[in-house]
Design a protein with these regions (language model features):
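Active-site segments that bind and position negatively charged phosphate/pyrophosphate groups
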Residues: 190-303, 311
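C-terminal charged capping/lid subdomain of soluble metabolic enzymes
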Residues: 289-370
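A short, small-residue-rich loop immediately preceding and capping a beta-strand
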Residues: 80-103, 107-117
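Solvent-exposed alpha-helices and their adjacent loops that cap or buttress functional pockets
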Residues: 3-5, 25-27, 81-82, 104, ...
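ATP/NTP phosphate-donor binding region
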Residues: 1-87, 310
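A glycine/threonine-rich phosphate-anchoring loop and its flanking beta-alpha core
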Residues: 105-198
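Short glycine/serine/threonine-rich phosphate/pyrophosphate-binding segments
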Residues: 18, 41-45, 95-102, 120-124, ...
Length: 370
């Protein structure tokens, strides 16, 4: 099998770049379908529409309904056809951006991805995560190429909720853990190929950056400051993690995230990254990570306020039957658990999740605030 490396055609990051982006946008198209949720539109979208129109770009704004489902993608695709869009812009969080990619693919036009949060590694990838209308994981949708443009305005990121940045750090923390598992098993990446050395190296650098600058960046956002530490973490969350997971591969951490979508209740109020955080700890447990490495991740998660127990996941009374549903969905043949370097059964997932919950409670009782 060949090795493949993928990345967006152009990546732009910095303070105030959103309103200095006309030259990048007009290279791609002048009839823009802008997909954005209500919050993103209020924060930046309305002003951005005016900015584009001032630069001779015709814009059709379509409100995003909040779920990257087939029905939502088809709905907006029809609007794009009627408008005659030659460029789709996704503005907002991960699900809006994933939907924008799918809509552009349906329309066979270019796509520009403009995240208003550094909360996931979705922006740079050539795939979308699809869910049912009710929010249960459905499938991955793959494309022939990565986005034509990813543009990240760190001034906007600095004014977003701190929780969104920590969620992005959590998502990015899985990148190297999963990439190294794929490497050990000589598995396949999300590009359907073997890892390149570059993809693996980026995943490793991503983890190094997160541990080095993560807490500084969180403090910066808490004070709405676009610091150098924040710039580094935004790049790690968005570019390094996005390229690293795609060219490095996914394994148990994201499969367990997908498994958790089988549960009902307030767990659905958690972000993608918050669920991935628990998935990463579970993968480390499955691998038999030594105590020093496991504790490094656990301590960092606790510092950032990320979920490390069932109570944190809003499932304090979860039953073995419900955990088995998580295990079964996460080990489905179409998910990334198959890239682990050893066979993982649903029962193994249940045992590992219970082990993480128990160890975190023990660790906190004996180490936190002692």
């Amino acid at each position: 099998m060949m090795s493949v490396f993928g990345s967006p055609a152009t990546y732009v990051q910095g303070k105030n770049v959103l309103f200095d982006s006309a030259s990048y946008i007009t290279r791609l198209g002048r009839k823009v379908l802008l997909l954005a949720g209500s919050t993103a539109y209020k924060i930046a979208g309305q002003k951005y529409v005016d900015y584009l129109k001032d630069n001779d770009v015709d814009v059709e704004y379509v409100p995003f309904n909040g779920e990257s489902s087939v029905s939502e993608i088809d709905r907006v695709t029809e609007i794009g056809k009627e408008f005659g869009a030659d460029l789709v812009i996704g503005l907002g969080g991960g699900k809006a951006l994933d939907s924008a990619k799918a809509i552009a693919d349906n329309l066979r036009v270019k796509v520009a991805i403009l995240p208003t949060l550094a909360s996931t590694d979705a922006p740079c990838s050539r795939l979308s995560v699809l869910y049912t209308d009710e929010g249960t994981f459905s499938a991955y949708r793959f494309y022939a190429q990565n986005p034509d443009l990813v543009l990240v305005d760190t001034k906007i990121i600095a004014n977003a909720p701190v929780r969104m940045l920590t969620s992005g750090i959590a998502d990015a923390l899985a990148t190297n853990v999963e990439a190294q598992a794929v490497a050990r098993g000589a598995g396949s990446t999300m590009l359907g190929a073997k890892q390149t050395m570059v993809g693996n190296a980026i995943a490793s650098k991503c983890e190094e950056t997160l541990f080095a600058y993560g807490t500084q960046a969180v403090a910066s956002v808490d004070n709405h400051a676009a610091s150098k530490a924040l710039e580094k973490i935004v790049e790690a969350n968005t570019l390094m993690s996005g390229v690293g997971f795609e060219s490095g591969g996914l394994a148990a951490a994201h499969a367990i995230h997908n498994g958790l979508t089988a549960l009902n209740g307030p767990i659905h109020d958690l972000t993608h990254g918050e669920k991935v955080a628990f998935g990463t700890l579970t993968q480390l447990y499955l691998e038999g990570a030594d105590q020093e490495r496991f504790d490094k991740f656990l301590k960092f998660d606790l510092e950032l306020g990320l979920p490390t127990t069932f109570a944190d996941l809003q499932i304090p009374d979860v039953s073995d039957e419900e955990l088995m549903q998580v295990g079964q969905l996460s080990t489905a043949p179409n998910d990334t658990m198959v890239q682990m370097p050893f066979t993982v059964e649903a029962s193994d997932v249940v045992e590992a999740m219970k082990g993480v919950d128990a160890y975190s409670r023990y660790y906190q009782a004996h180490h936190v605030n002692k």
